[in-house]
Amino acid sequence: EIIELSSYMEDEKLEIAKRYLAPKQIEKNGLKDNKIKLSDAVLKKIVSEYTREAGVRTLEKTIAKVCRKMAYQVVEQDIETPKVSVKNLHEYLGAPIFIDQEREKKPQVGYVNGLAWTSVGGVVLPCEATTMAGTGKLALTGSLGKVMQESGHAAMSYIRHNAKSLKIDEEFYKKLDIHVHLPEGATPKDGPSAGITMTLAMVSALTGRKVRADLAMTGEITLRGRVLPIGGLKEKLLAALLYGVKEVLIPKGNEKDIPE
């Protein structure tokens, strides 16, 4: 039997860093007598902008790196109590590695917030769609895996079959191409749970109807338009909350998971 363990949330990592990792590395690097402290703000920035993992191994290594540089300042530069702040953290660790994109503030045409579950937790996965003159071709970009590409084609088939009820020109595929893109193209993405997101993004692009910027969704789409349940609901909802999303659409089949 395989038991799946959820990744730590950011606030959990912060508490672990405050209570255990930072004190351990401060002592290990001989800084305990120098009254060195790493503030909550500094640790939070390290967690969110310099590490991206399910556990805290890289987090501890990153904190250790900061402590080693402070120890160097004490020994070589005769600075009795080095001060690390949010403003000068880059002097110890370089430029931030991970910078979360800001949420769109206004409703957009062809732009929908999806939700994904990765090895490091839940993430908001924006989906963009646009149309152009063509012959019904569907382009799917953003380093998408085979399953996610199949979801895009299933969404396209559903839209073509239901064009009339969706108030879309039934012959749109004869004169338009559709391009669906999931940003951060260097990051591989896969799985079926973005099906409903891609469907709505394409419908929005074809109808010109805007989608709320504070709305997110997740679910696998079938050719008949059914939205199937997905995994990682807890992690996805937490990601949506941190992103500033006010409402999330989930499959009916996941209703049983909400109490968790």
For the regions a language model picked out, list residue spans one by one.
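Residues immediately C-terminal
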Residues: 2, 65, 223
